[in-house]
């Protein structure tokens, strides 16, 4: 429908003295009833709308008979003239197009479509005219840019404060100062911008979006590095914990070894055998057993004195046939001594007699270079010198060195007797 013809028809209707219905204006009301689009302002078609409303109510009252039967006691019965005046008064007080204009135009174009009685028809019209909200014609049709809608109602506003937006509804307004958000540009339902003003607002927003993306990417770098550093710190902490566990295990193993050594020392003190010889090399084993009498003398001083007094007489007797005495009895006596001394010995203790025989054979050959052999020979020399002093004649140190067999036999007898005494005491 062309707006120019509509405006000419409205002007002609206003100029007429006698008001008559117009075909062009009736088509205009039918167009509003179908589409709801008001192509012109309220002031332009208000006169024809009031004329058409009054004529329809009169025609309906003339064509439709009065209500038959008794009236409903719950419904107030209002005369036709009073109801008509009330409706016309409300419509004349409008400052804009009511938002129920489409329904009102339907009632004006087809009054008997839903109603048969005059009273019900008037009540339906009254319900649709008793509204407050108003709408205004769209900017696309009448060329007016200062048109806005809020909740389906057209409102006159300033384009500097609001722009038309069709995202959440047919025309939801949006203030222009909200440019911080990247999605603040007004878009239609099809994704296209509404006007050139919105295109201008999109350019700074695009820059802000790129800057925000760049800042986000810049922030992501240190965050990733911090995460890597955190993983490295966690790995270092795990490595330190593993080292601490290993150190603890080593400490526990060392403590266990020390405890075992302490137990072995206690067993050696009880059995009176030097278990320390087991941990030494075989050469040390062959050298240490030469001086069992020295270990016994350090263990008990009283037993040494008794053994010296008792063995002095025997040594004086044994010194004369020492040159012809074989070494077999000495070996036998040492074997019995070791058997008594270590009844629960290991394989190393069983091998000691043979090592002792070899050491006795090496000792008189003049091997006195190592300090261990000297320490082992000193007690035997001291014992032989003490026995010679207690006997009839004094002997020199050269005689004791020249006759090693005599010292060995005497020390063997001395050791045998001194070993028998502690066993008897135990």
UniProtKB/Swiss-Prot annotation:
Pfam families: PPP4R2 (PF09184). Residues 161-426 are annotated as: Disordered. The keyword Phosphoprotein applies. Residues 234-244, 256-270, 348-358, 417-426 have a biased composition (Acidic residues). Residues 381-408 have a biased composition (Low complexity). It comes from the Eukaryota. The modification Phosphoserine is found at residue 370. Residues 332-342 have a biased composition (Basic and acidic residues). Keywords: Phosphoprotein. GO terms for molecular function: protein phosphatase regulator activity. GO terms for cellular component: cytoplasm; nucleus; protein phosphatase 4 complex. Residues 182-215 have a biased composition (Polar residues). Serine/threonine-protein phosphatase 4 (PP4) occurs in different assemblies of the catalytic and one or more regulatory subunits. Regulatory subunit of serine/threonine-protein phosphatase 4 (PP4). Belongs to the PPP4R2 family. This is Serine/threonine-protein phosphatase 4 regulatory subunit 2-B. It comes from Danio rerio (Zebrafish).
């Amino acid at each position: 429908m062309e707006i120019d013809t509509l405006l000419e028809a409205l002007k002609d209707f206003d100029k007429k003295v006698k008001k008559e219905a117009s075909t062009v204006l009736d088509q205009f009301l039918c167009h509003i009833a179908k589409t709801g689009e008001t192509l012109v302002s309220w002031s332009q078609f208000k006169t024809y709308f009031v004329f058409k409303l009054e004529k329809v109510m009169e025609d309906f009252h003339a064509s439709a008979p009065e209500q038959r039967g008794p009236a409903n006691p719950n419904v107030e019965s209002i005369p036709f003239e009073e109801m008509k005046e009330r409706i016309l008064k409300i419509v004349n007080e409008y400052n804009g197009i009511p938002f129920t204009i489409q329904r009102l135009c339907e009632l004006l174009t087809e009054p008997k479509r839903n109603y048969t009685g005059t009273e019900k028809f008037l009540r339906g019209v009254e319900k649709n005219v008793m509204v407050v909200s108003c709408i205004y014609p769209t900017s696309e049709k009448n060329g007016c840019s200062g048109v806005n809608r809020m909740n389906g109602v057209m409102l006159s506003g300033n384009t500097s404060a609001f722009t038309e937006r069709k995202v959440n509804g047919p025309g939801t307004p949006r203030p222009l100062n909200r440019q911080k958000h990247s999605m603040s540009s007004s878009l239609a339902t099809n994704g296209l911008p509404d006007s050139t003003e919105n295109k201008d607002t999109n350019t700074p927003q695009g820059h802000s979006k790129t800057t925000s993306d760049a800042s986000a990417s810049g922030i992501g770098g240190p965050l990733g590095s911090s995460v890597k550093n955190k993983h490295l710190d966690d790995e270092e902490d795990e490595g330190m914990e593993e080292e601490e566990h290993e150190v603890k295990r080593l400490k526990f193993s060392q403590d266990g070894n020390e405890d075992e050594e302490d137990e072995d020392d206690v067993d050696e003190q009880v059995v009176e055998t030097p278990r320390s010889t087991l941990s030494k090399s075989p050469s040390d084993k062959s050298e240490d057993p030469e001086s069992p009498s020295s270990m016994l003398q350090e263990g008990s001083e009283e037993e040494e004195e008794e053994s010296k007094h008792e063995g002095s007489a025997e040594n004086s007797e044994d010194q004369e046939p020492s040159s012809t005495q074989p070494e077999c009895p000495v070996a036998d006596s040492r074997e019995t001594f070791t058997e008594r001394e270590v009844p629960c010995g290991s394989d190393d203790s069983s091998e000691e007699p043979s090592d002792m025989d070899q050491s006795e054979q090496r000792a008189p050959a003049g091997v006195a270079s190592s300090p261990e052999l000297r320490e082992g020979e000193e007690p035997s020399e001291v014992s032989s010198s003490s026995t010679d002093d207690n006997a009839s004649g004094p002997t020199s140190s050269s005689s004791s060195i020249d006759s090693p067999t005599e010292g060995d036999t005497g020390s063997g007898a001395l050791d045998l007797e001194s070993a028998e005494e502690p066993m008897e005491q135990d």
